[in-house]
Amino acid sequence: MKKIAVDAMGGDYAPQAIVEGVNQALSDFSDIEVQLYGDEAKIKQYLTATERVSIIHTDEKIDSDDEPTRAIRNKKNASMVLAAKAVKDGEADAVLSAGNTGALLAAGFFIVGRIKNIDRPGLMSTLPTVDGKGFDMLDLGANAENTAQHLHQYAVLGSFYAKNVRGIAQPRVGLLNNGTESSKGDPLRKETYELLVADESLNFIGNVEARDLMNGVADVVVADGFTGNAVLKSIEGTAMGIMGLLKTAITGGGLRAKLGALLLKDSLRGLKKQLNYSDIGGAVLFGVKAPVVKTHGSSDAKAVYSTIRQIRTMLETDVVAQTAREFSGE
């Protein structure tokens, strides 16, 4: 049985969206058990599942504006902290939260703990491409500064994930840069490039540019945390902007525009789904001793369900243990 500790109080629509996503996951997956951490009375309002689920009550939670490290240290009974401790103590196999991203990263670093020989765990997510296959990118902001050695480790981690969780036999690894030529980039990118070229275990395809990411140029894209987070926000903003422009054009375009939208309804719905990567799951703090997964703060029940499905696959493929063995040299 795969045991998942869930912070029921994190996120914009908690606990309703969290619990409703859990209900659906428990209905569809008979091999998971969920521990819900949070306000028992509020959780029970939405919990319909009766088997393989338990509630661990706490009145304390971490708010979105709390300073991450201080919150983890001072709010020892917060729902997120208790969920992370359950993983550390072996009572759960993975932790899921839609709450404060920085606090969850801190919980991953300081409570769950790093895998031996991994210097800086990275935040990784699967982002959308026009062909619907997506690509994995890390680091998306777990670290403000990185070395070339960190980025090399991210390439190995991302390749492991793409192989074991997404089923890609030979993931194409690209280094995010300001040009595709091998001579491009600052000293960090140039040093990283040399490390990736020298690692024969990687299917390294060279430098990739941000404009090509959504065309599926690579299966795994490596970046420092600052750049990766900026690209993530740009993709999110572009997706929202496109949908907003379409909506404005349709609503303000008169009868002909509305009729055209009606004819294109299925295509527009498909476009919206393609740009909405919540179906794929959450962002993984990769490089810690167990799956620590952050779903978007605005996640609905469907996104929570998708993230639980993602965690289930990670546990099923034992990707974290395989990563630990790889980096420990066993």
Swiss-Prot record:
The EC number(s) attached to this protein equal 2.3.1.274
Q: Which gene encodes it?
A: plsX
Stated name of the protein? Phosphate acyltransferase
Taxonomic lineage is: Bacteria, Bacillati, Bacillota, Bacilli, Lactobacillales
Please name the pathway.
Lipid metabolism; phospholipid metabolism
Cited function: Catalyzes the reversible formation of acyl-phosphate (acyl-PO(4)) from acyl-[acyl-carrier-protein] (acyl-ACP). This enzyme utilizes acyl-ACP as fatty acyl donor, but not acyl-CoA.
> What subcellular compartments does it reside in?
Cytoplasm
**What is annotated about its quaternary structure and interactions?**
Homodimer. Probably interacts with PlsY.
A Pfam family this protein belongs to?
Answer: FA_synthesis
Keyword vocabulary terms for this entry: Cytoplasm, Lipid biosynthesis, Lipid metabolism, Phospholipid biosynthesis, Phospholipid metabolism, Transferase
Q: GO CC annotations?
A: cytoplasm
GO MF annotation: an example: phosphate:acyl-[acyl carrier protein] acyltransferase activity
SUPFAM superfamilies with a match to the protein in the record: Isocitrate/Isopropylmalate dehydrogenase-like
Q: Which reaction does it catalyse?
A: a fatty acyl-[ACP] + phosphate = an acyl phosphate + holo-[ACP]
**Principal localization?**
cytoplasm
The family this protein is said to belong to: Belongs to the PlsX family.
* GO terms classed as biological process: fatty acid biosynthetic process; phospholipid biosynthetic process
Q: What NCBIfam families does the database record attribute to this sequence?
A: plsX
